[in-house]
Amino acid sequence: MRRLFTSESVTEGHPDKMADQISDAILDAIIEQDPKARVAVETLLTTGVAIVAGEVTTKAYVDVQDIVRKTVLDIGYTRAKYGFDGETCAVLSSIHSQSPDIALGVNEAAEFKQGDKAEDEIEKVGAGDQGMMFGYATNETEELMPLPIMLAHKLAMKLAEVRKNGTVPFLRPDGKTQVTIEYDENEKPVRVDTVLISTQHEPDVTIPEIREALVKYVINPIIPENLRDDNMKILVNPTGRFVLGGPSADTGLTGRKIIVDTYGGAIPHGGGAFSGKDPTKVDRSAHYFARYVAKNVVAAGLADKFMIQVAYAIGVARPVSIMINTFGTAKVDEEKLRKVVEEIFDFRPGAIIKKLDLLRPIYRKTAAYGHFGRNDPDFTWERTDMVRELKAAFNL
């Protein structure tokens, strides 16, 4: 049976993504000076105000107000009529240190309190919280990501690009994209059914003008010719007007675009957000590692689709459970595949941080256009450097 599946993305000027970028810009500034800092920073944006709150334990000093303003201005909110102005907005900060009760479990995992020996200081790290994290990969795109979310991200990136470089001069920073893909009976994407773009714009431009520009400069360069047909629907600003945007139109909050950040709804989500969190928080680091595992399994040709769920207890280094699902696409025995994954990959938070080199100021750029499927050497969880080991485990 054929089916339709839809995913959305948003531009860097969307209020929730602004909040994510501010939180991660603060994290980067701290971790650059103090890689072992503990950071959990949330941002709320509304008309004329940015509020930053959270828990930070660090030896570093950072100018929160300056970081907020520079991030907002870099996104493109340089005038109040756009819905926010980085120069004139109020910035309120309420940051305190990490709870000592939480620090007890993160600084020294439960296993080592019970007498186990740590091979290495960093492997003493316990999970910063309980929860479950999911990783996924599919061979339907070269990025080994679901096609709907990849196209939605690419449209959103192109929308921001043509705004910033002046190709489409009447655009403003806020915007959203959405792509509906038709899949055939074999779960292969066969066509784009619907493309939706809602973009903030100057007040004196008409919808036909916006549509013409977006089709020419955004949609045509991104949507592959082989996935188009005469029945493909294009929707541009279907409300008819999108002049007021940004935090003046909608309150922005860190962690409210977790499906955009991951796989566009193609698989479950454990609920934990990424931005503003240092890598001892498994909400972030274990999600990255789960993607790393899934991508390597699919890249090795062991399955066409691969999902993994990993679950943790706060203060405990080793996961409480690991579950895999190949959706019937495994090329090897699935039970053996699970065992091989558990043997080859070390899911302890300290080992994850070490393997993926996560104690670096790399997070601001993850905070818009997806954390996965990106071609950037700093996104170490996108490497496929475990393919040889995985194949060897199956004598391939």
Swiss-Prot record:
Compartments it resides in: Cytoplasm
Region entry Flexible loop, spans: 98-108
Binding-site list for K(+): E42
List of residues binding L-methionine: E55, Q98, D250, K281
Cofactor note: Binds 2 divalent ions per subunit. Binds 1 potassium ion per subunit.
EC number: 2.5.1.6
Keywords, ordered alphabetically: ATP-binding, Cytoplasm, Magnesium, Metal-binding, Nucleotide-binding, One-carbon metabolism, Potassium, Transferase
The protein's required cofactors: Mg(2+); K(+)
Residues the entry annotates as binding ATP: H14, D174, G175, K176, R241, F242, D250, R256, K257, A273, K277
A GO MF label: methionine adenosyltransferase activity
Catalyzed chemical reaction(s): L-methionine + ATP + H2O = S-adenosyl-L-methionine + phosphate + diphosphate
Recorded GO CC terms: cytoplasm
UniProt: Mg(2+) binding residues: D16
Single GO BP term: S-adenosylmethionine biosynthetic process
Cited Gene3D superfamilies: 3.30.300.10
Keyword presence, Aminoacyl-tRNA synthetase: no
Pathway of action: Amino-acid biosynthesis; S-adenosyl-L-methionine biosynthesis; S-adenosyl-L-methionine from L-methionine: step 1/1
Function recorded in the entry: Catalyzes the formation of S-adenosylmethionine (AdoMet) from methionine and ATP. The overall synthetic reaction is composed of two sequential steps, AdoMet formation and the subsequent tripolyphosphate hydrolysis which occurs prior to release of AdoMet from the enzyme.
Family: Belongs to the AdoMet synthase family.
Quaternary structure annotation from Swiss-Prot or TrEMBL: Homotetramer; dimer of dimers.
Listed NCBIfam families: metK
Protein name: S-adenosylmethionine synthase
